[in-house]
Swiss-Prot record:
Family: Belongs to the MntP (TC 9.B.29) family.
Species the sequence originates in: Rhodopseudomonas palustris (strain BisA53)
Protein name (Swiss-Prot/TrEMBL): Putative manganese efflux pump MntP
Top-rank taxon: Bacteria
Membrane topology annotation: Multi-pass membrane protein
Gene Ontology MF, one: manganese ion transmembrane transporter activity
Length: 194
């Protein structure tokens, strides 16, 4: 993957955590130290989950070489579509999945794990295209750390509206990234231009 694609993927994967952090920041009104701690928890978990998915994907990669780009496209489209759907749902439905209002460690960890499940699915897809998972996982983790920290601080002042917009943009970016992988691996663009 190109550095630009890695940056887009990292930002896209961090938007769930950002949205949860804005929600949590709006309800908990954290200080800078609390926001940094939460960012660290989210970043570490978000970096680990694509590694888990990638490991599982490697096991299956040889079995599905002929359709790997379709699998990557499908997984990214499903994850992106889910993010778009959640971002456009009504506020009443969105509240059901919002970050827990309690500020204990376990609620924070549960929220971080919940927002990182999508990264595991993306990790599976990355195994099929032979991407450098270590660079990507580090980039996703760092980006999530920054976005979560900033999101919690923004949540103190702006509230939940900004978080839903970020989730929508992230979902659209993932669908676009999936389409780009499909186009590159099927040669459609080369055929059209050649």
């Amino acid at each position: 993957m190109t550095p630009g694609a890695i940056a887009i993927l990292s930002l896209s994967m961090s938007t769930d955590a950002f949205a949860a952090a804005v929600s949590r920041g709006a309800s908990h009104r954290p200080g800078v130290v609390s926001a940094v701690k939460a960012g660290f928890v989210f970043g570490v978990i978000e970096a680990i989950t694509p590694l888990i998915g990638w490991s599982l994907g490697l096991v299956a990669a040889d079995l599905v070489k002929e359709v790997d780009h379709w699998i990557a496209f499908g997984l990214l489209t499903i994850v992106g579509g889910k993010m778009i759907w959640e971002a456009t749902r009504s506020q009443d439905h969105h509240e059901e999945g919002a970050a827990p209002k309690r500020s204990n460690r376990w609620a924070l960890i549960a929220t971080a794990v919940g927002t990182s499940i999508d990264a595991a699915a993306v990790g599976v897809g990355l195994a099929f295209i032979g991407a450098n998972i270590w660079v990507i996982a580090a980039s996703i983790g760092f980006t999530t750390f920054v976005c979560t920290t900033v999101g919690m601080l923004i949540g103190k002042t702006v509230g939940q509206r900004f978080g839903k917009m970020a989730e929508l943009i992230g979902g659209l970016a993932l669908v676009g990234l999936g389409a780009m992988i499909l186009i590159q691996h099927t040669g459609v663009l080369k055929t059209q231009l050649g």
